[in-house]
């Protein structure tokens, strides 16, 4: 079992010494330091921590905001750590302690995951409601059709089809129109 510290500051002019001090007080085997915004997922040192992680290792952070700012990213990170049979511990957020089967931590993580899912569902619901309202007001018409009525390639494909001298595959290859789109257009034209 190794104690792995992860320190992150948002920029090069911020001082990580407080985090170093707090982690060194409990004794770390190795400390990874990152100087990059927590909002970005592209964090080289965090990826090294996860790649080097072994069974029974514990990742220590002084504060959850040091490892991630997004609840969804936190859950993905926790799943990744658990998959490797390792743990995550936050010194400030003492409720998060995956180093043992702590039922309170498990409960809080489950509740937070539920709240996170609810938030995503509410966003989708509001988006659908907004689209419906915009449709009623004539402001939203959905995705623009790729092949509008004056599309030269589609019109040429229909003309070639009606001439009957080529196969559908040949027509589609020449005009760069998909088979499904051509058949859909032919169905519209014939009705």
From Swiss-Prot:
Annotated Resolvase/invertase-type recombinase catalytic domain residues: 2-138
Keywords per UniProt: DNA integration, DNA recombination, DNA-binding, Plasmid, Transposable element
Gene Ontology molecular function terms on file: DNA binding; DNA strand exchange activity
Active-site residues, Swiss-Prot/TrEMBL: 10
DNA-binding region: 168-187
A UniProt-annotated Pfam family: Resolvase
Gene Ontology biological process terms in this record: DNA integration
Keyword Iron carried by entry: no
Cited InterPro entries: Recombinase_CS (IPR006118), Resolv_N (IPR006119), Resolvase-like_N_sf (IPR036162), Resolvase_HTH_dom (IPR006120), SSR_resolvase (IPR050639)
Top-level lineage group: Bacteria
Family: Belongs to the site-specific recombinase resolvase family.
Biological function: Resolvase catalyzes the resolution (a site-specific recombination) of the cointegrated replicon to yield the final transposition products.
Record-linked PANTHER family: DNA-INVERTASE FROM LAMBDOID PROPHAGE, RESOLVASE HOMOLOG YNEB
Record's protein name: Transposon Tn1546 resolvase
Species of provenance: Enterococcus faecium (Streptococcus faecium)
Lineage: Bacteria, Bacillati, Bacillota, Bacilli, Lactobacillales
């Amino acid at each position: 079992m190794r104690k792995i510290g992860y320190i992150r500051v948002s920029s090069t002019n911020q001082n990580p010494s407080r985090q170093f001090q707090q982690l060194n007080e409990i004794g770390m085997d190795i400390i990874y330091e990152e100087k990059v915004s927590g909002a970005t997922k592209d964090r080289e040192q965090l990826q090294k921590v996860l790649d080097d992680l072994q069974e029974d290792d514990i990742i220590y952070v002084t504060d959850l905001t040091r490892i991630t700012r997004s609840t969804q990213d936190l859950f993905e990170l926790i799943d990744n750590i658990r998959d490797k049979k390792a743990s995550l511990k936050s010194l400030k957020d003492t409720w998060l302690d995956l180093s043992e089967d702590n039922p309170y931590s498990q409960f809080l993580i489950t509740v937070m995951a539920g709240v996170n899912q609810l938030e995503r569902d509410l966003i989708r619901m509001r988006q659908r409601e907004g689209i419906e309202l915009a449709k009623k007001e004539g402001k939203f018409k959905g995705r623009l059709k790729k092949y509008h009525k004056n599309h030269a390639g589609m019109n040429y494909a229909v003309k070639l089809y009606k001439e009957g001298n080529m196969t559908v595959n040949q027509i589609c290859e020449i005009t760069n129109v998909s088979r499904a789109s051509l058949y859909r257009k032919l169905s519209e034209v014939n009705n």
